[in-house]
Amino acid sequence: MPRHLSRWGLAIAAIALGLSLLTRIHIETLWFTALGIPTVFLRRLAVQALLFSVVGIAITGLIGGNLRWAARHQTDQPDRPAPRLQLGGLLTVLTLLWIALLALTTQAILAAWNCQTGRALPFLPQILTLDWLQSSLITAGSWPLGMGLLLGVGSLVLFLWRPWPLLIGLSSLTSLAIALLTSREWLRIWPAFAAESVSDRDPIFQQDLAFYLFRLPALEVLQFDLWIGLAFSFCAVLAVYYLAKQSVSNAEFRGFAPSQQRHLVRLAIAIALFLAGHCWLAQRQLLFSELGAVYGIGFTDRWVKLPLLQVWMILFGIAAIALFWQSRRGLLPQRWIRNFQLAAIASVLIWVTLPAIVQQLVVQPNEIARELPYLKQAILFTRRAFGLDQIETRTFDPQPSLNRAVLAANRETVQNIRLWDTRPLLQSNRQLQQIRLYYSFPSAQIDRYRLQTSFGDALQQVIIAARELDYTAIPAAAKTWVNEHLVYTHGYGFTLSPVNSSAPDGLPRYFVKDIGANTRIIGDASLGISTEAVKAAISTENPRIYYGQLTRNYVFTPSRTQELDYPSGNDNVYNIYDGKGGVTLGNYAQRLLFSLYLRDWRLPFSGDLTAQTRVLFRRQIEDRVRAIAPFLRYDAEPYLVSVNADTAEASGLGRSSLFWILDAYTVSDRYPYADPGEQPFNYIRNSVKVIIDAYNGSVQFYIVDPKDPLIQTWSRLFPSLFQPIDAMAPVLRSHLRYPTDLFKAQSSQLLTYHVLDPQVFYNRDDQWAYPREIYAGETATVQPYYLITRLPTAASEEFLILTPFTPLGRNNMIAWLAGRSDGEEYGRLLLYEFPRQRLIFGPEQITARINQDPQISEQITLWNREGSRAAEGNLLVIPIDQALLYVEPLYLEASRNSLPALTRVITAYQDRIVMTPSLLESLQKLFPDSTPALTPLEQPVLTTEQSAVLNPDQP
């Protein structure tokens, strides 16, 4: 190709790349400005640009400077005869070094580049640790190794043909790749400059934990950058000197010239100093060792690996000084080179063999005695990292005291026993409330609302499900550009169901159902809740959902084309968006920029758009919050909250009535001695609550744990992003709940780390497990569930998340953990342990007893034979005073139509199990003692029919 054409091609490519970059920066700035947080993006952009520039210049200078020196001295001749070396062996060694470097670099870059930064911060591998190098070469897989082999051999062939164009190209690409990679790692580098003391220190090096949480991740990234720069420089310079002076044609190497040797010695000094620093860093990384019975530094790490690293750190420093001193005197003696080679081989052998020998011959025969002090640290730091040290432990001794009088005294608990699970309710919704194929209910969540009832103000547990628009369900013939971006723009409304009520046919009851003008808000007489009470707490005034879980396409609104609002009979009702979401399209020039940003060539030619049209993009709530704060990890279960429009306006929320609440976490994998278990992190705090307006798309971040050092640091870096929790509108704050993902992580760690005695911990004879249950005919692990109950020492009912535990390998229940959600008690964990000398039935044992009951099993078998299927719901353990009540709903589904109907309720208490059509009948049958006279407070709860069932002797 002519040189002028290639230059034109490069110029055009550079202009296109620059235009694309500037367009992206401009549109992102508009997007963040529309959200009221432009400084969040501009600060991030400035940091990334600074990292890219500094690292790019540094790596380019390092590699380029060495190559320039090598080019100047590549033809220098040795000043004295040197033994001739066969080039074949040298070429083989150089090729293997080059392939290993490229393979390991490719693997590390891909691991960091492909990480999902929102779910957990990207974790680079421990570059240059011998364990990582060994495992990477063995287990890297065909892709990185194959890529390294291909690049290594290919570059070597090209190098023999056109060495300098190849070296310049590879060095430029390497510098660019490292600069880009480092700029992406701003999440781990920037906090190191804003971190403050955590006050706690690690037990080995006595360093503040802020070093491990903030500075160690940054040092690991910079170590990686320096390693690539030095390794590339050394290999490239070595290749230049080896293959110069007709070495290839003569098939022999005549030795290095003094200038070349001085150059290589300077590189060797730099590498020795780097390795000394790496050994210092690797000592701290031992705090995350997984060797032996302890997570963190154990006996072998403390007395073998740590001393080895300390000795090597000193030796590398001495080697650097010796090399510098000897290089000033002249050429390195051959014995020095041989000694360095022998020392390197010996070091690798010692690192691989000595820890294994000590672990197997010294530690394992006396493991408990050797590891005891380290087990204490692992228990202590793991409990701190997961917040288990804040759990309040109490004894729960179930008594045979449950009767109708106790149930009456705990009316709000009984009234909120969940009979509808989210899965069968979603099945019902999809058949009864989906309305059209393009609507979908992606999830249903448990929440509570405080409603005015005929017996007073009370909490009511509900299941809420958003009716979102799923564009993927649109028929293929209707999938046009206009429909995708102008017509099908939003979902509509939601369903709200009490968890404890069903219609006479067994289908769920609804507080809110249907769509558009037919939307109905309905009370529930059986619960003593009027329609007016529901309307006072819940609004359907602005039910449109422009931002949700399924809203992945960008839309333009308002436009000259009306948007589909909702179907009405055989027709559709249309609407025009009047919200504040999105970015104004503006003039035609900006329209062209949006076209480039969205990669949508139709956009500039659409006649339906105006200057006032807004571009609503990044509408999927998880994508939206991750774009704003990628340093947080987000819960898998966002939930919708409906707010009375008048209350919302009075609280400064505008006339919006639907808001998403999403829990966000600060996480790290650099908390010393903290065992991550099955998680990709070993430290977690629920530091932030995120509120997203479903109509306008506004996003607010509220700090709920100001003591967390991670969120303290991020709030200093982004002061305009976060608000204190006291700034949240009370109407939304009343819907906060203990987050599911955090509770699962904590309860998972508690299975092992409830044990404080290291001897018992090591023996593993007091491990817990999650109980099992039969759900819809399949065995499944009991998942944490929300409920409303009154804790034994509490004054009133509250909204909790609860999970039971059983001993490992046994089915009886041994404890239960509760996370509190209401008021000042929010965020507290309570662990109730059962007496060890008594047998408390676990869910699996209750399930077995249900299956063994002849009447229940006969009825279920009969249903299954009649073309239907009886599906078990979640078996709930309900603590009431000092007793445990077990409740399991039973649904009936037709074999051809999976529309579940609540057909029976099974309740169990002590050695009694009953199954009846309703919860009230079950309780009446389960507790057949005489019923005390109902007080006026309790009378409105029951309908006439229900009262007759529960109180047959009352007139």
Curated annotation (Swiss-Prot):
Protein name, per record: UPF0182 protein Synpcc7942_1783
Subcellular locations according to the entry: Cell membrane
Family the UniProt entry places it in: Belongs to the UPF0182 family.
Topology term for the membrane: Multi-pass membrane protein
Annotated NCBIfam families: PRK02509.1 (NF002707)
Ranges annotated as spanning the membrane: 12-32, 45-65, 85-105, 141-161, 163-183, 224-244, 263-283, 306-326, 343-363
GO cellular component terms given for this protein: extracellular region; plasma membrane
Source species of the chain: Synechococcus elongatus (strain ATCC 33912 / PCC 7942 / FACHB-805) (Anacystis nidulans R2)
Keyword Cell inner membrane found: no
Ligase listed as a keyword: no
Keywords, in A-Z order: Cell membrane, Membrane, Transmembrane, Transmembrane helix
Source domain of life: Bacteria
